[in-house]
């Protein structure tokens, strides 16, 4: 492991324990600022990943994140957030963590070293060739993730390796390679820091841009959100008010007439049509508002 960048000592923090608190925080902040720039070189590869994810999602495939420890938790987090944000099923975007759900809050000893379980966890969700599997591992050598990617390849699923070391092991088992070289961690080997931040940013990009590509966004608005609480209900009404140029009360009335569906409300108003017709237009255009209003 000595050759791994994530295990190398950071020369900026060699005496971290002797720094005063303010200087230590400034140093940590400076190191964190390196992360977004480290992602920039992989944007061409990331573009191909997202294009594939859009195509597969539109053909009934799923996006599956799989990892161990911090990497696994980040995948589960991103998948979970997609349900209310984009009104997708929990079965459309899935996060799997080594050791199961208990591992979200408690470290499960040895879980990351079980390559066979990585494959088994994909078998348990009935992996299909139309799915895309994103293996997440800061080191790029986690056996659990390697096992999952090897199995995914056998099933002819699309595979993506997301790591924070160049020439990583998991990259050898994937169709797409995303290697984010964030450099040594502030605290040597603590990949929950810069590596975790990089992984979170990349997962944000994958899920957000894929959902835009499948019609879940109008301009920069979350028009397919699931209004499950008061905050989201108010946001839904504000979106309708903004897009349709209505006052607050008019937006509320349209929201009610649309059966609490932002997309339907927008199409109803912009096309001066009924709820039934708006629903049909959206269905015929895969839920993409701008296509529906031009039909």
UniProtKB/Swiss-Prot annotation:
Belongs to the GCKR-like family. MurNAc-6-P etherase subfamily. One of its GO terms (molecular function) is carbon-oxygen lyase activity. Pfam families: GKRP-like_C, GKRP_SIS_N. It catalyses: N-acetyl-D-muramate 6-phosphate + H2O = N-acetyl-D-glucosamine 6-phosphate + (R)-lactate. Residues 53-216 form the SIS domain. A lyase-type mechanism (elimination/hydration) is suggested for the cleavage of the lactyl ether bond of MurNAc 6-phosphate, with the formation of an alpha,beta-unsaturated aldehyde intermediate with (E)-stereochemistry, followed by the syn addition of water to give product. This is N-acetylmuramic acid 6-phosphate etherase. Homodimer. It comes from Staphylococcus epidermidis (strain ATCC 35984 / DSM 28319 / BCRC 17069 / CCUG 31568 / BM 3577 / RP62A). Pathway: Amino-sugar metabolism; N-acetylmuramate degradation. It is an enzyme of class 4 (lyase). The active site is at residues 81, 112. Disulfide bonds: none annotated. It comes from the Bacteria. Coiled coil: none annotated. GO terms for biological process: amino sugar catabolic process; N-acetylmuramic acid catabolic process; peptidoglycan turnover. Its EC number is 4.2.1.126. The lineage of its organism: Bacteria, Bacillati, Bacillota, Bacilli, Bacillales. Specifically catalyzes the cleavage of the D-lactyl ether substituent of MurNAc 6-phosphate, producing GlcNAc 6-phosphate and D-lactate. Keywords: Carbohydrate metabolism, Lyase. NCBIfam families: N-acetylmuramic acid 6-phosphate etherase, PRK05441.1, PRK12570.1. InterPro entries: Etherase_MurQ, Glucokinase_regulatory_CS, MURQ/GCKR, SIS_dom, SIS_dom_sf. Gene3D superfamilies: 1.10.8.1080, Glucose-6-phosphate isomerase like protein, domain 1.
């Amino acid at each position: 492991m000595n050759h791994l960048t994530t295990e190398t000592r950071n020369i900026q923090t060699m005496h971290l324990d002797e720094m005063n608190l303010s200087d230590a925080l400034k140093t940590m902040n400076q190191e964190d600022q390196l992360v977004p720039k480290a992602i920039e070189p992989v944007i061409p590869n990331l573009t191909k990943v997202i294009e594939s994810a859009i195509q597969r999602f539109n053909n009934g495939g799923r996006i599956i994140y799989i990892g161990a420890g911090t990497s696994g938790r980040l995948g589960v987090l991103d998948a979970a957030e997609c349900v209310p944000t984009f009104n997708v099923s929990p079965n459309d975007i899935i996060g799997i963590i080594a050791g199961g759900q208990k591992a979200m809050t408690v470290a499960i000893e040895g879980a990351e070293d079980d390559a066979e379980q990585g494959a088994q966890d994909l078998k348990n969700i009935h992996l299909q060739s139309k799915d895309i599997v994103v293996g997440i591992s800061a080191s790029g050598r986690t056996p659990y993730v390697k096992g999952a990617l090897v199995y995914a390849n056998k099933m002819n699923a699309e595979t993506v390796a997301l790591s924070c070391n160049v020439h990583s092991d998991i990259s050898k088992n994937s169709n797409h390679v995303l290697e984010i070289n964030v450099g040594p961690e502030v605290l040597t080997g603590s990949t929950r820091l810069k590596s975790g931040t990089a992984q979170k940013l990349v997962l944000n990009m994958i899920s957000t841009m894929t959902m835009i590509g499948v019609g879940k966004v109008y301009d920069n608005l979350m028009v397919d959100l699931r209004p499950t609480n008061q905050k989201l209900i108010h946001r839904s009404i504000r979106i309708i008010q903004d897009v349709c140029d209505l006052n607050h009360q008019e937006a509320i009335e349209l929201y009610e007439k649309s059966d609490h569906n932002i997309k339907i409300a927008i199409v109803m108003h912009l096309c001066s049509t009924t709820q039934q017709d708006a629903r049909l237009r959206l269905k015929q255009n895969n839920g993409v508002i701008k296509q529906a209003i031009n039909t």
